[in-house]
Amino acid sequence: MFDRLEDTVNRYEDITAELGNPDVVNDQEKFKKLMKEQSSLAPLIETYTEYKNCKKNIEDSLAILDEETDEELKEMAKEELNESKARVEELEHELKILLLPKDPNDDKDIVVEIRAGAGGEEAALFAAELFRMYVHYAQARGWKVEVLSGDETGIGGMKEVEFMVKGQGAYSIMKYESGVHRVQRIPVTESNGRIQTSTASVAVMPEAEEVDIHIDEKDIRIDVMRASGNGGQCVNTTDSAVRLTHYPTGIVIYSQTEKSQIQNKEKAFALLRAKLYDIETQKAHDAEADARRSQIGTGDRAEKIRTYNFPQGRVTDHRIGLTLYKLDKIMDGDIQDIIDACIAADQAAKLAKMGED
């Protein structure tokens, strides 16, 4: 571990030196790349620096206890020694986590797809509530949300919605939301007061740039048409809506949220790239299925990950056995406790596997 840490320190120092080179400063592409790498290494460098300082404090405290005759100074040194030893243990754990292999997609922006599942209109209402929950969470973090496409129902539900979230570390945080979400409550459409179980699926995909995924023009059909609202009424007198059909996969993308055909086309292609990149990522994940079974946030879209029980005001994440009784706050976007617990469980599983290896 410490060889890797020293290698990281050397790399950090090399980057810092390069950033002071006028030739690098004038090369904006290289400068930005180095700045990004330096920023990603900074937490590890800061933690390792504190670790080395604590180890030095332990040496100094032991020397005082060995050489000093003043009882008051020895008592202070003993207190400093105990504090430093405890902190060293914490820092060693933090360093192990920081040295875990990083998901190459963690720094990417994301495309989120929510689809109503079993439960008819109630499932569509739940899908719309999940959408609002994620929008509120993203806004609280200062992230930008951009709707790519959506299919609303007449009473405020959503059969499906696809949106982009732009913000630092969006994928690293939101990837744990992929899976089937289940709601248990008495639907507003239910006259006899029976509790119904409905579902909605969430897929969190890293945004794919053109360099990440190549789309051959001959594999795409582009149709333009007039945008329409609920019930099919025309909401635009120009052919601004865009539909993409990707022949090899059968994926169809429809975008009409913007007034400009060019903007709708850009959004449609962004969504298509994300879906194609996600297919490739899922293939790679499936090839490592055995290694992933013990991990949280594996992205298994069929996995029932969470239940929202309205009569009990309860939310349970089944992957980690976490139950919280603050459903109203969670539906309003307060999901950080759940995400933090998923991240911690994922890190613990990876550390355990690293220990086995």
Swiss-Prot record:
The keyword Protein biosynthesis applies. SUPFAM superfamilies: Release factor. The modification N5-methylglutamine is found at Q233. PANTHER family: LD18447P. Peptide chain release factor 1 directs the termination of translation in response to the peptide chain termination codons UAG and UAA. Belongs to the prokaryotic/mitochondrial release factor family. This is Peptide chain release factor 1.
